[in-house]
């Protein structure tokens, strides 16, 4: 995937802690392909401890993987627009809460500011959703983002249609291919994919 070599990619983490195990191998792959990956984290990522791990541990892990200090404030994220422009901004996982804010032009976290700065530069933003209400109240926000210029999605599908019928999660292993397409301002297809791992 040599097309990613030398590309400056912002990588935003939001608070879907249960999805990190699927995301971090993709960060490592981007680094191995020669991309310059700049980590960006929301306030919740840094401060929240869950059964999936402590916030500080996840931040240290992404810093160790990328070799860069995590951007953890809106002030630090703002220069990604004019002074340190990204070739592409990734938000994965993207929670329903952050998706709602992004769709409605709110910039109250470092990750959302980094996305706004990238869109301002007419560069692609890649989203990897992980939300329990993608087919519920957040459906309108999902559709709004899908029809927004310079926003692209890691293909996604229902992860548990019987127990959580409104839930949708991106297939994170498709992230590198999605970025390659997004850099050409194209959406990786198909965008709706089978993502159910159960036996029902």
Curated annotation (Swiss-Prot):
**Which keywords does this chain's UniProt record carry?**
NADP, Oxidoreductase, Sporulation
**Matching InterPro entries:** Dipicolinic_acid_synth_B, Flavin_trans-like, Flavoprotein
Keyword Oxidoreductase part of the UniProt annotation? yes
Species the sequence originates in: Bacillus subtilis (strain 168)
**Assembly and oligomerization:** Dipicolinate synthase likely consists of DpaA and DpaB, since both proteins are required for DPA synthesis.
Name what induces it: Is not expressed during vegetative growth; is expressed at stage 5 of sporulation specifically in the mother cell compartment, under the control of the sigma-K factor. Is repressed by GerE.
Superkingdom classification of source: Bacteria
GO terms assigned for molecular function? oxidoreductase activity
One Gene Ontology BP term is: sporulation resulting in formation of a cellular spore
- Cystine crosslinks: none
The reaction(s) this protein catalyses: (S)-2,3-dihydrodipicolinate + NADP(+) = dipicolinate + NADPH + H(+)
- Entry protein name: Dipicolinate synthase subunit B
């Amino acid at each position: 995937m040599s097309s990613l070599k030398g590309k400056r990619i912002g990588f935003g983490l939001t608070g879907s802690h249960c999805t990190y195990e699927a995301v971090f191998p993709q960060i490592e792959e981007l680094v191995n392909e020669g991309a310059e990956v700049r980590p960006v984290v929301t306030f919740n990522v840094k401060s929240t401890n869950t059964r999936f791990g402590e916030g500080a541990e996840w931040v240290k892990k992404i810093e160790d993987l990328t070799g860069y200090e995590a951007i953890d404030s809106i002030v630090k994220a703002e220069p990604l627009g004019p002074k340190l422009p990204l070739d592409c901004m990734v938000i994965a996982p993207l929670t329903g809460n952050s998706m709602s804010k992004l769709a409605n032009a709110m910039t109250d976290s470092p990750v959302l500011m980094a996305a706004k700065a990238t869109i301002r530069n007419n560069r692609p933003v890649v989203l990897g959703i992980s939300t329990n209400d993608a087919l519920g109240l957040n459906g309108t926000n999902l559709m709004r983002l899908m029809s927004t210029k310079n926003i692209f999605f890691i293909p996604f599908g229902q992860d548990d249609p019987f127990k959580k019928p409104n839930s949708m999660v991106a297939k994170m292993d498709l992230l590198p291919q999605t970025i390659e397409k997004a850099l050409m301002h194209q959406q990786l297809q198909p965008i709706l994919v089978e993502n159910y791992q159960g036996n029902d």
